[in-house]
């Protein structure tokens, strides 16, 4: 049995091929088009995977994508009413995901009607959990997925045992540890997609002097909020405008619009411009950001 995994229309677009239970290849599109964090459809990565496996498109039995457009539909519809522009952008992504069979056929100059594969849409965070647990050496494990946003959730947790996963809870948009980290990264003068690692490294050179404020930015009390955390939304704008993101073009690095509000500057001081020098204050804020993340 040949299974093709496709991560498309998201940062780090990639593909993987599993043949008879063995991972043959897994690679990101950026390795071929030389675009950092390339999004779009990973046609070159898919071509490489099939070549490495010595098979053709006709030999693929199953295709899995880490996105379920129908997950949390009620929440999506609610935000569509509140944020029409955001809804239109997400609708464009939905159209692309439903067109993956056509994009796959086009990558091989084939007719979509010739595809014999069965397509599977896997909820975003369940795909994260599965990709970690099912290749681990553990028979049982606690599972956690936390990122910016996927299928309108930012965090999911549960347990794994044998070949099964049990989902115990999730945190829905707009509350997100990933968007929290990205927002403060932007505030500290690092606006590009994927810049968070710079701030994580910077944290080692500072002291968490603003931890009290960061505990208001991300609120977590296991006694009063047993099902997760909450963002202090006054510090953010994504819940009002939707996170502006570009994922469609494989020839470009993804972009993310502004996430933090004026309240963050009011409470923490003026936001740093990208060209401004790094001061000890910025290092201390980075340390506070990281410390609060680790607390939660």
Located regions from the model:
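Short acidic/glycine-rich loops and adjacent helix/strand connectors
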Residues: 1-296
């Amino acid at each position: 049995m040949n299974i093709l995994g496709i991560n498309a229309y998201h940062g780090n677009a990639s593909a993987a091929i599993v043949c008879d239970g063995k991972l043959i290849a897994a690679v990101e599109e950026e390795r071929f088009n030389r675009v950092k964090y390339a999004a779009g459809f990973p046609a070159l990565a898919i071509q490489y995977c099939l070549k490495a496996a010595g098979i053709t498109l006709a030999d693929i039995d199953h295709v899995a994508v880490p996105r379920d457009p129908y997950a949390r539909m009620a929440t999506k519809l609610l935000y569509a009413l509140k944020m029409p522009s955001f809804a239109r952008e997400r609708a464009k992504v939905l159209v692309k995901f439903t067109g993956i069979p056509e994009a796959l056929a086009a990558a091989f100059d084939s007719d979509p009607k010739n595809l014999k594969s069965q397509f599977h849409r896997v909820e975003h965070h369940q795909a994260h959990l599965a990709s970690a647990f099912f290749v681990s050496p553990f028979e049982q494990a606690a599972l956690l997925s936390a990122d910016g946003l996927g299928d309108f959730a930012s965090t999911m947790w549960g347990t794994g045992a044998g070949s099964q996963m049990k989902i115990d809870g999730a945190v829905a948009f707009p509350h997100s540890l990933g968007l929290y980290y990205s927002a403060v990264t932007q505030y500290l003068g690092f606006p590009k997609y994927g810049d968070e690692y710079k701030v994580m490294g910077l944290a080692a050179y500072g002291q968490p002097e603003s931890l009290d404020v960061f505990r208001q930015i991300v609120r977590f009390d296991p006694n009063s909020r047993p099902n997760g955390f909450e963002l202090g939304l006054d510090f953010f704008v994504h819940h009002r405008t939707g996170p502006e993101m570009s994922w469609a073009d494989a020839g470009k690095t993804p972009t993310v619009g502004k996430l933090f509000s004026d309240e963050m500057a009011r409470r923490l001081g003026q936001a740093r411009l990208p060209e401004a020098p790094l001061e000890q204050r910025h290092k201390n804020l980075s340390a506070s950001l990281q410390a609060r993340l680790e607390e939660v």
